[in-house]
UniProtKB/Swiss-Prot annotation:
Keyword Lipid metabolism: no
Signal peptide: none
Disruption phenotype: Mice homozygous for null mutation exhibit defective keratinocyte differentiation, however the skin and coat appear normal.
The protein, known as: POU domain, class 2, transcription factor 3
Assembly: Interacts (via the POU domain) with POU2AF1 and POU2AF2 in a DNA-dependent manner; this interaction recruits POU2AF2 to chromatin and increases POU2F3 transactivation activity.
Major place of residence: nucleus
Residue span of region Disordered: 1-39, 130-180, 248-267, 352-419
All copies of domain POU-specific, residue ranges: 176-250
DNA-binding residues: 274-333
Length: 431
């Protein structure tokens, strides 16, 4: 602790010109070997009216600021300060820091005196740990430039005391969230396994929860819960309901006496939709049933009962197996049993009323007169079909029947109904 009693007697004077001269003489006594530094400090001193509150400031502040030089030797501070601005060469010896602190404290405005209780509230060990680390920086900020006022330098002196405080304290529930996520993941897996073991679908669970607890959930919601595809908040809300339903579902068939009569009538309705498990039949039993099916594909009820007793199976299982086997036999034998229908284009060739197409009649030559006359359109019913009639329509009956469809009264008018392809292919057509 630095003894400041000589300076107290000098600063308790009133704020006139005589006080300023006495203060200058005081600084001159503290620093007899540094006249230049004393002159620089005399230029920065401003005379102000110092009251009782300033005396309290002088009595408290030096104890915080004077601890920095005690922790750091003077040669280390001078080495750190050598690279700074030439105006910062004032603080080179521990004795200079005291004068600087006195100068800064003398410039403290009355508005910043409310910060003193906060500085006193910090323990002495904390300030001892902070000031050795921030000593050079604190000194360089305090004596930055001669033009800076004391009020602008005060926040730099107070800031290092607040830096080591933790900005974000870990909340008490920060470590619980991963645990909750792990618990939710485990519960979702166990819930899915137990639900399948009980034989319930996801839709059954949603309907059961709607009937029992009044909260309707869809099959999609249950599926997303099992897949961990819901938000953390919704999964936390859904977990106790699903856990309660699972406990009720497991305790209902095994211990019906433990349930209340008001709750489990609804449970029995829900459990009535319980899905049946898929029946797996062993290989030797399946071979025996195949032999019985080859002998009698449709056994009677008595025969089904007898087969079930022989194979130690349920009658309903044997009956369902025979039904499924008959359906399988129908699917296998269906294409072979039905007759093959003729193609559609064959019926056009056989039909007497069908029109002639390019594929139905081959090109007609003079050597095949019978084919042309017998396969003409139905409008030529009275046409003679004998080969001796010839290709040319010389008889009057043939010309009368073809008068509507004739384009001209030429010798080939009887074949106009056969289409343009016949006129082009006929040897008598003039190209």
């Amino acid at each position: 602790m630095v003894n400041l009693e000589p300076m107290h007697t000098e600063i308790k004077m009133s704020g006139d010109v005589a006080d300023s001269t006495d203060t200058r003489s005081t600084f001159g006594q503290v620093e007899p070997g540094n006249d230049r530094n004393g002159l620089d400090f005399n230029r920065q001193i401003k005379t102000e009216d110092l009251g009782d509150s300033l005396q309290q400031t002088l009595s408290h502040r030096p104890c915080h600021l004077s601890q920095g030089p005690t922790m750091m030797p003077g040669n280390q501070m001078s080495g750190d300060m050598a690279s700074l601005h030439p105006l910062q060469q004032l603080v080179l010896v521990p004795g200079h820091l005291q004068s600087v602190s006195q100068f800064l404290l003398s410039q403290t405005p009355p508005g910043q005196q409310g910060l003193q209780p906060n500085l006193l509230s910090f323990p002495q060990q904390q300030s001892t740990l902070l000031l050795p680390q921030t000593g050079p920086g604190l000194a360089s900020q305090a004596v930055g430039r001669p033009g800076l006022s004391g009020s602008s330098l005060e926040p730099h002196l107070d800031a290092p005391q607040h830096l080591p405080g933790p900005k974000h304290l870990p909340g008490p529930g920060g470590n619980d969230e991963p645990t909750d996520l792990e618990e939710l993941e485990k519960f979702a897996k166990t819930f899915k396994q137990r639900r399948i073991k009980l034989g319930f679908t996801q839709g059954d669970v949603g309907l059961a929860m709607g009937k029992l607890y009044g909260n309707d959930f869809s099959q999609t919601t249950i599926s997303r819960f099992e897949a961990l595809n819901l938000s953390f908040k919704n999964m936390c809300k859904l977990k106790p309901l699903l856990e309660k339903w699972l406990n009720d579902a497991e305790s209902s068939p095994s211990d019906p006496s433990a349930s209340t009569p008001s709750s489990y009538p609804t449970l029995s309705e829900v459990f009535g939709r319980k899905r049946k498990k898929r029946t797996s039949i062993e290989t030797n039993i399946r071979l025996t049933l195949e032999k019985r099916f080859q002998d009698n594909p449709k056994p009677s009820s008595e025969e089904i009962s007898m087969i079930a007793e022989q194979l130690s199976m349920e009658k309903e299982v044997v009956r369902v197996w025979f039904c499924n086997r008959r359906q399988k036999e129908k699917r296998i034998n269906c294409p072979v049993a039905t007759p093959v229908k003729p193609p559609i284009y064959n019926s056009r060739l056989v039909s007497p009323s069908g029109s002639l197409g390019p594929l139905s009649v081959p090109p007609v030559h003079s050597t095949m007169p019978g084919t042309v006359t017998s396969s003409c359109s139905p409008g030529n019913n009275s046409r003679p079909s004998s080969p001796g009639s010839g290709l040319h329509a010389s008889s009057p009956t043939a010309s009368q029947n073809n008068s509507k469809a004739a384009m001209n009264s030429s010798s080939s008018s009887s074949f106009n109904s056969s289409g343009s392809w016949y006129r082009w292919n006929h040897p008598t057509y003039l190209h």
